């Protein structure tokens, strides 16, 4: 069986980081975007994941290792983006969650219990370069920002992999935000003046 070419972890991490940073720069989160991309797959540097990749070993959580590195700077919401970059943004959970619960707290506890393979100490994972954030309850604005960062990371991850597999694929630039807003407004205008009997009640 002919073996497919393998993209190195370093190349994928750097490519994803640059793409994610460029996307996130649009709303002032370039540094967070870069770190999310740079560390989202740190867990692939574990012996467990390499066995999965090279020898069809058991499935391994590769998303939590990098998330925990970022979480050490109190960037919990960014860590949640990384933790869920394949499975979806996790609920943050509560202190009652046991290790392995499908929440941020559950996976954090599973990590602390060493039930998730650690990164191979011989792999040179770069340090997380983010300022520590004060611990506080997330606001609505932070919740929205988190979803934007999550979208940036998922898109960057997918596009970097696509580029490696298929080469550079030309993509349309799409319409700008002003054009899209006008199009949405025209669509919503249909409901401004109710004309049906039901809408007039």
Named regions from a protein language model:
Residues 1-191:
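Accessory nucleic-acid engagement/destabilization modules that flank
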Residues 189-201:
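N-terminal pre-Walker A segment at the start of P-loop NTPase domains
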């Amino acid at each position: 069986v002919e073996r497919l070419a393998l993209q190195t972890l370093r190349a994928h991490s750097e490519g994803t980081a640059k793409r994610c940073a460029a996307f996130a720069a649009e709303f002032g989160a370039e540094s967070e975007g870069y770190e999310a991309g740079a560390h989202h797959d740190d867990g692939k540097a574990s012996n467990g994941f390499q066995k999965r990749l090279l020898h069809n070993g058991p499935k391994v959580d590769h998303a939590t290792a990098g998330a925990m590195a970022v979480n050490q700077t109190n960037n919990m919401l960014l860590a949640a983006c990384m933790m869920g970059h394949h499975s979806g943004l996790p609920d943050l959970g509560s202190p009652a969650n046991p290790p392995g619960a499908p929440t941020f707290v559950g996976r954090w506890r599973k990590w602390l219990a060493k039930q998730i393979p650690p990164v191979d100490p011989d792999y040179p994972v770069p340090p997380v370069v983010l300022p520590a954030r004060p611990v506080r309850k997330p606001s609505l604005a932070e919740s929205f920002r988190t979803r934007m960062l999550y979208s940036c990371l998922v898109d960057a991850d997918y596009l970097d992999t696509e580029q490696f597999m298929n080469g550079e694929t030309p993509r349309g630039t799409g319409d700008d935000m002003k054009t899209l807003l006008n199009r949405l407004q025209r669509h919503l205008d249909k409901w401004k003046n109710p004309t049906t009997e039901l809408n007039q009640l």
